[in-house]
Amino acid sequence: MSGEDIVEIYTDGACSGNPGPGGWGVLMIYKDREKELCGGEQATTNNRMELMAAIQALEALKRDAHVRIHTDSNYVKDGITKWIHGWKKNGWKNAAKQPVKNAELWRRLEAAISTHQVSWHWVKGHSDHPENDRADALARQGMAPYLPSK
């Protein structure tokens, strides 16, 4: 499969305080087209926003696709590629037998990837990676309406 047949997705989440107001941002690239998405919530966590970025990106795809998701969140990458199998086997409990945090978002992410061929790639955050920097700016843009007025 050529690189032109792959949707490249860059995701990021941001939070002012943890918990606090937060936002998510997505940059999607397919061939010569780009699409930007962002949103936010009043009271959330950074991990929830990282998950929402990936979910929103995948849910925005109009047809089954080969997808490369680039994230600076090991929580998201490891959660969906490694930990989720054990969580499901253990009734959505973690290794300490506690309920998995953000289980509803993990289920939503799992459903969102089910029709796509997805590979997950970690990128170092805030390291002058242009596409990741754009996703970060979009996450901050998504968070902005929820920040207290100065």
Swiss-Prot record:
First-level EC class: hydrolase
Gene Ontology CC, one term: cytoplasm
Enzyme Commission no: 3.1.26.4
Keyword Nuclease tagged: yes
Biological process terms in GO annotation: DNA replication, removal of RNA primer
Residues given in the record as Mg(2+) 2 binding sites: D12, D136
Major place of residence: cytoplasm
Protein name: Ribonuclease H
UniProt organism field: Parvibaculum lavamentivorans (strain DS-1 / DSM 13023 / NCIMB 13966)
